Amino acid sequence: MQTMTRLTLLSAIAILAGCASQPPAGPPGKHLVYRDSNGAATRQFDYPDIAFCQKVEALAGRSARCQAEGASGLAAKATLRYNPPGVLVQGQYSDLNRCRTDTSSLPPGVQLVAACSPK
């Protein structure tokens, strides 16, 4: 009986945590914005169109959403190239440390074209 109670309690906590960390809803756009558990933007990638953004969003997880408007308060930037298809993407980050950490190890098919700098 205690096991069932614990499982029910853990399930409820997981559901509440998921709801609390949902980014604001809005119309889709070409800005893929990642947010922390408090809703603050930590990084953003500006894709050439909504379809490209939504493909990446499907792989990115729950902390990222394609938005029509870019996030405010991001202080650093870097330019990345996605191969294929050879698309340049502007990345924006909460600060230079976040930018340098994120771009120090990129997944296969992603290259750093322009290093981190203040916006």
Q: What are these model-predicted stretches?
A:
Residues 15-18:
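C-terminal motif of bacterial Sec signal peptides marking the signal peptidase cleavage site
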Residues 24-38, 74-84:
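A short beta-strand micro-motif
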Residues 117-119:
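Short, solvent-exposed mixed-charge patches
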Residues 70-104:
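Short, solvent-exposed interaction modules
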Residues 1-8:
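Bacterial N-terminal signal peptides that target proteins for export
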Residues 20-22:
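Bacterial signal peptide processing site
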